[in-house]
Amino acid sequence: MIAVARVGQHAAFAILPSRTVFSDQVVIFSLSSRAAFAALQSRPHEVWTRFFSSTLGDGLRYTPSDCFETFPFPEDWQTNTALEAAGQAYYDFRAELMVETGLGLTKTYNRFHDPDEDDPKIVRLRELHAAMDRAVLDAYRWTNVLTDCEFLLDYEDEGDDGSRRRKKPWRYRWPDEVRDEVLARLLELNAQRAAEEANTGDGELFA
């Protein structure tokens, strides 16, 4: 089973035994492959999630009907060996790092996004995340999208007129132009698949 906190700062996904007892503050997916993990933990899915989800303070509220059910996964992602391998490498390294440091997901990702954090293993985790993003983008055949990240600040408009802006924590992320490009492609793909489903009358709509 793949799980993610319903509200969290980082939308960090984990693979847990099916016998685990979950609270209602955890979203559960009946998936367990590393390819599924790679797709969900990737920045393309994060871009989609941040566009469609609501926020609670600095946290992200993950709603499956908005963030998961509408997400256009790459074609044949379940059998994509490159996606499986990238997800496996990232997941295993992250798990080993958490055991070594004794830190959970939130504190590990706080280090991941900290511009002053230069521990070699955190740097390696960032590299593996970029490799996982590359595998996901390649699965979409979007080979011309770059995976380079920067430490950037996000801002949240406050007030009805947007006159006040609240600074949010640093994030190691894609530049805005890359995020916007990937989101536009995902929205287009989502619309194409919804139209195909409507024309054939088979299955559920993607949107």
What do the predicted segments below correspond to?
Residues 1-207:
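S-adenosyl-L-methionine
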